[in-house]
Amino acid sequence: MTMHPLSLACLLGMAICTSAHATDVAAASAVPQATALPTIEIHADTQNGFHSAAPVQTDKSDTPLAQTPLSITVVRRALLDSQQSLTLVDALHNVSGVVANTYGRRGWDDLIIRGQTASDALFVDGLRTAGSNRVAEQLFGMQQVEVLKGPASLLYGQVLPGGLVNLISKRPGTEPMRRVDLGLGSDGLRQGSLDLNQPLSANSKAALRLTALAMNSDDPTEHVYFRSRWIAPALALDLGERTDFVLLTSYQERDYIRQQGLPWEGSVDPNRNGRIDRALFTGEPGQTPYHSHQSRLSYVLDHRFDNGWSLHHAARWQAFGLDGLLIASNGLAPDLRTLRRTGMQQAFDGRTWVQDTYLQGDFLTGSWQHTLTAGADAFKTWEWNVQSTCQVGTLNVYAPVYGRPIVCPTTPSRDTLNVVASGGAYLRDRIQFAPDWQLLLGLRHDLSHNRSEDRGAGAQTRNDTNATTGSAALMFDTGGGVHPYASVATSFYPNVGTDVQGATFGPEHGRQVELGAKMEVGASTSLSVALYDLRRRNVLQNDPLHDGYSIAVGEQRSRGVELNAAADLGSGLSLFGGYAYTDAVVTDDGGQRISSVGQRLNNVPRHSGSLWLQYAAHGAADGWSISGGARAEGEKSAYGHRIPGYMVFDAGLAYRQRHWHYALNLKNAFDHDYFTGGLQRAVALGDPRTLLFSVGVDY
């Protein structure tokens, strides 16, 4: 199915108009009732709905989201629970301008923001992660997901210009809470989780929280499976009324055989032999599964001085490991039925230390009100990578016979150590220079040291860089809840590694200009629109002539528009949706022999979007809720192939009775066959119809 180019935009537009009108009507009709009887239920809906007006951690300020001249989308826990989202990919399907799961069910977090790769831009509690997407994040342990779109180097340093994803961990609370959930689903999904919170002091400021999860699941593809174990104790200490201190820890183990997609011919492209079965496994049933583990130990300290200034300090130590055998498609033979395969025995081992510290305070210069943020951050990461290229026999994709030998050499083809150390200082001033005008100015300087060591060859390369980046934004308050703004921001990202000649790469630089507007309708509806032009220069891509090496191309450009809506409309109705138009192309290929100027960037649809509605019943049907929505992507291209667009529909039904919670969700309700993206020699499969059922109890 090819999505009509503007169908989702029209759908979202109608939803936005409906939400704005419904909010006005609901507000007008609710005033007498709210005045006469301000019930706790209304407050609970506000706290647990889809809409978020509160300040976000990603902005490093206490400014309400509608008054922030940045494109930030917040996916709250209420929306995640309504959809029974199990993975970060599930959560990001709700965010306009984000393309998730481009490489299918391979066990990693793959994402693109505003047309630019962002898999290395994953943050947890405001601190960068190690190895980024190689160990998939555990969504159950997160309270909400914040996505900052556009260059974020001012506050976060070395970040690719498309944006970043910041996951906010569940933290100890002030109320006792114990919850256990059990879940079952399609393809043998079995999941159990617990979430416990216990105050430890009379004022409940000291508290302990424990979250844990165990999950086993098979896959629509034969021989593919996923096993996950995760636990996260967190401790809040009472260090006085002016100081907050939280210790956050987690440990995760995952074992899986990844889904590697299918050959292009016979799936997306025609094949004279017919269609290839979507359940085909292109690896070997006896291959070594992937095993990954990840440990985190972090703390967050916030102190409020008596002069109105505040100090924030956070740090984390993280270790991860990943090893396993990859069997990948190497293309079909001329008979278009014999799949040539290659194997890669992989082992990654990484360590990361990261910290961020900043002071923040308000002061006046004449009639101008300033909010100044001055900070410094640093990180150091070590990553060892050992790989061996293995020989694997061919496979008849129409009549597969498994059991071919896998021959791996005793000497690895790659044995490298990469060390990245970086530090930066930043300064941001939010200036209210008139009652309705604010100006945001920021400047940052980074120093970066990268060292790559080829332990097999005994060679070593160094790449030391420094860069100054910044941002500026102007926002106007119209007085009617509408806040138009204009902004410009730059980014910096050091390129690691060498080309086939052994030469190091210069750093990437990005720049974005954005025009937008944010609107608050009442207290529980927010709408936003953003138009942007983003340029990314000196971008690394795979060398088309030398496998395993990279080249730097001249420039990529993304232009687009994004619409967003989040609303809790009263009477139990909530809405969350977004639409994006993204035009992402190569504008300068650096003079490559085979020109790519004008080509669309891989796996980026021009049109994409989603919409989710939920209705929580009252009166005789109190406790029941029903939800549903759609998510869609238009046609996109990948490595010279066309991937058709799609639209899939999801639905949910939930019931709550005192301490018991029941939820039933159906994803891809009409079992539409679709594809999410592609690699050079394989196309990634979308998820078929999936049924999820869960039961939980509070005690």
Annotate each PLM feature.
Residues 215-219, 231-238, 242-304, 319-350, ...:
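Acidic/polar loop-and-plug regions of large Gram-negative outer-membrane beta-barrel proteins
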Residues 31, 35-176, 180, 515, ...:
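Acidic, small-polar-rich N-terminal luminal/periplasmic segments of exported/outer-membrane proteins
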Residues 117, 570, 575, 631-637, ...:
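C-terminal beta-signal and adjacent terminal beta-strands/loops
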Residues 436, 533, 552-639, 694-698:
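Gram-negative outer-membrane beta-barrel transporters
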Residues 300-306, 310-316, 320-326, 484, ...:
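Membrane-embedded beta-barrel scaffold of Gram-negative outer-membrane proteins
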Residues 297-320, 341-454:
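Face-selective signature of the C-terminal outer-membrane beta-barrel domain
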Residues 236-240, 350, 369-381, 416-536, ...:
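Structural signature of Gram-negative outer-membrane beta-barrels, strongest in the C-terminal barrel
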Residues 140-143, 154-233, 239-245, 295, ...:
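Outer-membrane beta-barrel translocator/receptor signature
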